[in-house]
A protein has these predicted regions:
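Glycine-rich dinucleotide-binding loop and its adjacent helix/turn
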Residues: 47, 139-192, 196, 224-225, ...
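Residues forming the flavin
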Residues: 2-3, 8-12, 18, 26, ...
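FAD-site-proximal beta/loop scaffold in flavoenzymes
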Residues: 152-168, 251-328
């Protein structure tokens, strides 16, 4: 007998879990379909394990770059990869348990398996059919790979989190935040690391101050940056090493090669055609601002829509969707403007709003005023290994409304959230000037710029 639900989410990642739990809280009969572990990319092969590894790299850097100037004996050189991975796995297991508990508390049926549409209201899972009045597609994305000879010898970000040991020599190919973060972590943990980017720099869509500072630090601390590097082929050598060959004749031999050239939607195995759901030329599901697809009763959130590919965005969109559908809020939807983001690079980056070039293009040069600060964070200033910290406020109009906040340096990852609230509320430079600084902190620079 076919089982019927009020609401079904395909995909047990951040967006699917957030939306289905919110719907269940409002008394809806709900099911969540997931073939793998709960939590999706973020919890299992993304944000969470990446952040654990980033912390590990920071600890190593604290010991070897800064420890001696703070009076510590830093001759310790032992690092146990297996211990780190065990700790990371245990932490992720606790998150899985938490998800299971909350879903159970909300009486959500968790169905293990792959879902395929039979029609716009019917799904097939594990040979059985289920129906629903509302269906959410939250299948996320997966890493992309280049179409070159030897591509199979490399791994992607998923494969990085399955490594049994830290390789001695690593090449990371890509210029986005995933490539920058992975290269930074691997370099920070002590491997000889190379980052290959297709054009002149990584993170080219960020404010130029961010990009320039990141490249400056990379040139001093690593990883080794290779610009204008277009992969041609990968050759596996007799000793098991890999040689990455570039189109211009350059090459580099490493023990591990990681593709981090971008991500693509995971929409191709759920038989969208049977439901009539439209996708664009890149395979992303087309949705409106309310997360509606072209088919009534079918919705999509997260990385499979081509929107901002960040976990909190999928969570926020999923919850707002359930508020609209099941809590009598007909206009509830996510505002995708001014979404803050952090890159867990070395040093970390925080940014929200318009870059300086974007503001000048949108408002005109005569309407834009920029405030900057460049200094050395106290954490590194008392040592011989000093690292830059740079910040920028982008303001527009006679009232100097703040439309962009950008920073790179120690502590920026934890600093940005509150300032993002201020920008979202329409704060002006005068509002920042009228705020008393917290001293001594790096954050005080944002309210003392002149």
């Amino acid at each position: 007998m076919t089982k019927h639900y009020d609401y079904i989410a395909i995909g047990g990642g951040s967006g699917g879990i957030a939306s289905i739990n919110r719907a269940a809280m409002y008394g809806q009969k709900c099911a969540l379909i997931e073939a793998k572990e709960l939590g999706g990319t973020c919890v299992n092969v993304g944000c969470v394990p990446k952040k654990v590894m980033w912390h590990a790299a920071q600890i190593r850097e604290a010991i070897h770059m800064y420890g001696s100037d703070y009076g510590f004996d830093t001759t310790i050189n032992k690092f146990n990869w297996e211990t780190l991975i065990a700790s990371r796995t245990a932490y992720i297991d606790r998150i899985h348990t938490s998800y299971e508990n909350v879903l159970g508390k909300n009486n959500v049926d968790v169905i293990k398996g792959f879902a395929r549409f039979v029609d716009a209201k019917t799904l097939e899972v594990n040979g059985e059919t289920i129906t629903a009045d509302h269906i959410l597609i939250a299948t996320g994305g997966r890493p992309s790979h280049p179409n070159i000879p030897g591509v199979e010898y490399g791994i992607d970000s998923d494969g990085f989190f399955a490594l049994p040991a830290l390789p001695e020599r690593v090449a990371v190919v890509g210029a986005g935040y995933i490539a920058v973060e992975l290269a930074g972590v691997i370099n920070g943990l002590g491997a000889k690391t190379h980052l290959f980017v297709r054009k002149h720099a990584p993170l080219r869509n960020f404010d130029p101050m961010i990009t320039e500072t990141l490249v400056e630090v990379m040139n001093t601390e690593g990883p080794t940056l290779h610009t204008h590097a277009i992969p041609k082929a990968v050759v596996k050598n007799a000793d098991g090493s890999l040689t990455l060959e570039l189109e211009d004749g350059r090459s580099e031999t490493v023990d591990c090669l990681i593709w981090a050239i971008g991500r693509e939607p995971a929409n191709d195995n759920i038989n969208l055609e049977a439901a009539g759901v439209k996708t664009n030329e890149k395979g992303y599901i087309v949705v409106d601002k309310y997360q509606n697809t072209n088919v009534e009763g079918i919705y999509a959130v997260g990385d499979n829509t081509g929107a901002v590919e960040l976990t909190p965005v999928a969570v926020a969109a999923g919850r707002r969707l359930s508020e609209r559908l099941f809590n009598n809020k007909p206009d509830e939807h996510l505002d995708y403007s001014n979404i803050p983001t952090v890159v867990f690079s070395h040093p970390p980056i925080g940014t929200v709003g318009l870059t300086e070039p974007q503001a000048r293009e949108q408002y005109g040069d005569d309407q834009v005023k920029v405030y900057k600060s460049s200094f050395t964070a106290m954490y590194t200033a008392v040592t011989t290994h000093r690292q830059p910290c740079r910040m920028k406020l982008v303001c527009v109009g006679p009232e100097e409304k703040i439309v962009g906040i950008h920073g790179i340096g120690f502590g920026m990852d934890e600093m940005l959230q509150g300032f993002a609230v201020a920008l979202k509320m329409g704060a002006t430079k005068k509002d920042f000037d009228n705020t008393v600084a917290i001293h001594p902190t790096a954050a005080e620079e944002f309210v003392t710029m002149r």
